A protein has these predicted regions:
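A conserved beta-turn-beta hairpin within the catalytic core of GNAT-like acetyltransferases
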Residues: 26-30
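Short strand-connecting beta-turns/loops that link adjacent beta-strands
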Residues: 12-14, 25, 76-77
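Unchanged
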Residues: 37-125, 150-151
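Conserved acetyl-CoA binding element of GNAT-fold acetyltransferases
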Residues: 31-37
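Short loop/turn segments immediately following the C-termini of beta-strands
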Residues: 22
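Conserved catalytic motifs of the protein kinase core domain
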Residues: 15, 31, 79-81
């Protein structure tokens, strides 16, 4: 089975999410997607996620918490994709490698276009968006931060 992991970053200071724009030479070129990639042998999903993010953006920011968000299993059961939401205290600027053409911090429901089909399948599901909002609200309450989502 082929396995992969990816994530969006959720900034607790703004309530915005960071997505990656895939490079012109990648599969699904110039679509907006999650950071991540394929697992190496015997790698757990979280290990894949952290390795891939480190490769794609040079250095990881201080991570507040990692939340499982969604798991996709193909109909033929030969491919699985684990999506996570990583909370960070504040927005940061990634140092993108050649797999990315750029990045964007965006508000909930203000997704850039075109979305990669996998990202679209997660971000356009109301229950997944609600889960992201719940993650944000729980974390910002713990840290006594203002609720930026009220402005979206």
């Amino acid at each position: 089975m082929i396995s992969a992991s990816g994530c969006c970053f959720l900034a607790l200071d703004t309530g915005r999410i960071m997505l990656q724009q895939r490079s012109k030479t990648s599969s699904h070129p110039l679509t907006w997607s999650f950071w991540g990639g394929k697992s190496e042998k015997k790698e757990r999903p979280i290990e894949t996620l952290l390795r891939e993010c480190n490769e794609e953006m040079g250095i990881l920011p201080d991570i507040e918490k990692v939340y499982p968000l969604h798991t996709f299993l193909s109909d033929d059961k030969k491919f699985t994709y684990n999506t996570f939401c990583i909370t960070v205290f504040e927005e940061f600027i990634p140092v993108c490698n050649s797999e990315s053409s750029g990045y964007a911090w965006v508000g909930i429901h203000a997704w850039p276009k075109p979305l990669h089909r996998g990202a679209r399948a997660v971000l356009e599901q109301p229950d997944m968006v609600e889960k992201i909002i719940t993650i944000y609200n729980r974390q910002k309450d713990k840290l006594d931060l203002p609720n930026w989502l009220d402005s979206f």
